[in-house]
A protein has these predicted regions:
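Non-catalytic pre-domain segments flanking phosphatase-related domains
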Residues: 1-126
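A structural signal for short, well-ordered beta-strand segments and their strand-loop junctions
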Residues: 5-7, 20, 125, 161-164, ...
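Asp-based phosphoryl-transfer active-site loop
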Residues: 117-139, 252
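A short acidic (Asp/Glu
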Residues: 135-138, 171-176, 198-201, 256-262
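Well-ordered, non-membrane alpha-helical segments in soluble/globular domains
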Residues: 140-149, 222-234, 276-289
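Substrate-recognition element of Asp-dependent hydrolases with the DxDx(T/V) motif
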Residues: 150-176, 187-193
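Substrate-recognition "cap/lid" segment bordering the active-site pocket of phosphatases
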Residues: 172-245
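Asp-based, Mg2+/Mn2+-dependent phosphohydrolase catalytic module
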Residues: 238-248, 253-303
Length: 303
């Protein structure tokens, strides 16, 4: 466990955003007008001088999943805002790897965006091949129960994303064959190997969804990179999802999980299998248990 110093700005104009710095002295590089939009400031070490901000200590591992859970538990929050650091002196903690981190000077622009959700949603990211569809040449749906399960997730205030390492043509053709078009808010394709950084995107006007490839350099030294939340978080912001409660990955490959709040590692499906109820229960149980533990009564968007 690491001990983090948390400075709490109860007068912040915008709630839930977190600025992470290496040390207290780095705050001298941030203008006061910018700090007014930051509710929490986090760093390791002690406060070097007197401050008007309230102070707490948080014990959490230096990894994002544990940090997010313990931070929300300590401050009784149902969700967190964006993570910021200093472009001129970025924080170097492990928890920031593969998470979307903004320069603190971008905050005034970011907080001006209107969110499409009044209550922050849960985000569920699905793999496609051998997760939702079979590995057959003529693909089939894994289990017909998937359709109703996705509808239920929508009713639970979830943003549903699809991330396939297949090319766009494969994704579009497969979704059409198994009639999964229209279920996903964001669809990502390609980007499995380091060096694939096309920035192309194409809008499907019929289903109001964007097919996008993944234009990110990731902090992973591997020929087969995992499904970094940084990519999903970037497109959520583009989709005007400013805040979210949790992010879940549903995938047959355990190596694709990195920093997700929840991971459902299901079995592969070379051919159809009647088992979706098992995996769907795991997804829903996590969401419902979370909403009980972190109720929305604590939700504040702007004050």
């Amino acid at each position: 466990m690491d001990r983090w110093t948390v400075l709490f700005n109860s007068w912040a104009l915008v709630k839930r955003h977190i600025l992470i710095v290496n040390k207290f002295e780095d705050l001298r590089l941030v203008e006061s007008s910018v700090l007014n939009n930051i509710e929490y400031i986090v760093f390791k070490g002690d406060v070097a001088c007197r401050t008007r901000l309230k102070q707490k200590w948080l014990c959490a591992r230096d990894e994002m999943k544990d940090f997010r859970f313990r931070f929300k538990s300590e401050f009784k929050l149902s969700h967190l805002g964006h993570i910021f650091t200093l472009y001129t002196r970025p924080a170097t903690y492990n928890l920031l790897k593969e998470w979307l981190v903004y320069d603190v000077n971008e905050i005034n622009k970011i907080v001006s965006f209107d969110s499409v959700f009044f209550i922050p949603p849960h985000v569920v990211v699905f793999d496609m091949d051998s997760t939702l569809i079979t590995e057959e040449k003529e693909v089939r749906i894994r289990d017909p129960a998937i359709y109703g399960a996705l509808d239920e997730l929508k009713s639970l205030n979830c943003v549903i994303c699809l991330w396939s390492y297949g090319d766009r043509e494969h994704v579009v053709d497969s979704l059409d064959k198994v009639k999964l078009n229209g279920y996903f808010d964001i669809i990502l394709s390609e980007g499995k190997r380091a060096g694939e950084y096309s920035v192309g995107e194409e809008e499907d006007l019929r289903y109001d969804v964007l097919y996008k490839s993944t234009p990110f350099y990731l902090d992973i030294e591997s020929s087969n990179i995992p499904k970094s939340p940084r990519v999903i978080l970037w497109y959520l912001q583009k989709y005007n999802v400013m805040f979210f409660k949790t992010i879940t990955l549903v995938d047959d490959l355990s190596e694709n999980n990195i920093n997700y709040d929840n991971f459902v590692n299901l079995k592969t499906c070379p051919v159809p299998v009647d088992d979706w109820n098992v995996w769907h229960k795991k997804i829903v149980r996590f969401i419902t248990d979370y909403d009980i533990a972190f109720p929305d009564k604590n939700y504040v968007y702007k004050v």
